[in-house]
Amino acid sequence: MREVADEAVLPNLSSPTAAPPKTALGRWLRAGHRLDEADHSSTAPWGRVLWLTGVDYFSTLGYQPGIALLAAGALSPIATLILVAVTLLGAVPVYAQVARRSYAGQGSIAMLESLLRGWGGKLLVLALLGFAATDFVITMTLSAADAAQHAIENPLLAPYLGGHNVLLTLALLLGLTVVFLAGFEEALGVARAVVVPYLVLTLVVLARGLFEITLHPEVIARFRLDLAAHGDGTALLLAGALLFPRLALGLSGFETGVSVMPLVAGNPDDPRGGPPHGRIRATRKLLVSAALIMSVLLVLSSVVTTMLVPPAAYAEEGPAAGRAIAYLAHGLFGEVFGSIYDLWTIAILAFAGASAMTGLLHLLPRYMPRFGMAPQWTIYRRPMVLLLFTVCALVTLAFRADVEAQGGAYATGVLVLMLSAAFAVALELWREPRAGASGRGHAGRAWSLYFWIVTAVFAFTLIDNVVVRPEGVVIASLFVVGILTAAAASRFRRATELRVLTLRIEDPESRALWTRMVGKKVNLVPVRADYKIDGPLTFVHVTLVDNRSEFLAPLRVTVRQEDQDYVVEVAGATAIANTIAYVSELLDPVTLFLGLTGLSLMTQAFRYLLFGEGESGLMVYKILVRHWDATPEADVRPKIFLMSDSS
């Protein structure tokens, strides 16, 4: 028997997912904080989190210069300069706005979620989560595969590793998984230990390359002749602009930059309920710093590799293909230094998935469990890490650890997320003046127009990428379909949970009347009819929210008395049957009378799943039976009468 507390909000009913695990393995899997809640004890200064973001962003230096050479040849520096301009003038401002408006680690998807209500909004979010999963999962698998490829092409390691790309890739992914099973703090430490030496070694190679260029003026003369063959300055800029989308992988890292915001420490006085201004400022510093470091390295690497790497070397299957800086490290410093550089390139590529793993761990648990579209255990870190490793292992096996085969999907995922972010920011700024910001209305509109231009640039980049690499859309679509399928299956399976977030009794009179009803004192009746029964009746009226796609609901209850009977008004429900079942469990009535419509079960099932209506009487019975099976008690269950409306 349950007695009502004095507080207006009643304690939630127990559920099998809330029960503590009974085994040691279960306790280990659920250890640590929940991923759908902020953990203020696991934050670090933005300078430390920078390396976690940078482990993905900076790792593209392992293959980006080689891709630029293969795609643009002598025009690689021009195309790279345009890429840097798009980064600093487009991506950085966009994600600075995203950081201000979506500071809980949900990225630009949270901004777009509010554009559409109901199932349309849910489908939009799920589709974007599919592209985010494409971006982040392929980041992990492609980077690990490229690390394996670098190891196999190293002259010292090749005799021991040749021909085992897949096994080596899986081993590297397993190592990343072990780090994240240990915790986020360990991941931050490993990221810094990997990234800083890699950047120092890269700067050493590029500085030596620039020195070599100054010693050989003929290299500069040959480069100028190659540029002159493409026309004047206008022609070079136009050609570079057309080639720049092929370098789109150099834009990766920004979505993960905002998705790891929960790890960034803010000011001690940041409000818990409002915008954490200190964390937002720190994240903006992180984004700008990462972009500036990467921009300098991209420009230097494009100039050095274009002038010093011969075309035969960076052609497909050439010794510099996909590893132009590593090729120069061996050529300029010898095998010992070259192998050291290879080792750190392997390390940063192997750990490049760290920011992607962090992003997914902060992204998926904040959406899909809330939508009822993922099992409840996905809110815990260790089960999610193991799930993501399984997905990455399957992707690696499907692609046979082929770096080139995964490149199209990677670029597609990155560009779709950047396009959606730019679109969301432009739309938000366009709407703000209409919301009453009179003094800043014109400035807001001007910024909105600027971000619409940025949106157009990202749209052009995405379309060009899809035309050149259409297989990327196919692979990304498979991820989207996978997310949608898993979401639908989980929503169907979890539909018969109680689905109540909180229950608040609105006024003191209602609380007093509620207390009188609890504990085998009334007969619960969701519909009014003629009954011949002893004892008072409690009539339950349920009002549904407008957005029936929501999974959990905060209920508001008022109670009034009519003669010896009671009327319970429940507002804010997402499903009639689940709400009646929840109220029944709280009141613990003697008898529960339920109606049956006798209409098509198929139609009623769809009405229940999509709109919270349907054959409510039958569904109340099923929900209660499932709840009773999962939470056995010594209490006597109420008698349930299912009565057809036609009888």
Q: Which role does the model predict for each range below?
A:
Residues 1-38, 496-647:
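Cytosolic C-terminal regulatory domains/tails of membrane transporters and channels
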Residues 117-122, 162-171, 265-297, 365-400, ...:
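Loop-to-transmembrane helix boundary motifs in multi-pass membrane proteins
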Residues 196, 200-252, 467:
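Helix-loop-helix junctions that connect adjacent transmembrane segments
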Residues 207-217, 266-276, 288-324:
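Extracellular/periplasmic helix-exit of transmembrane alpha-helices
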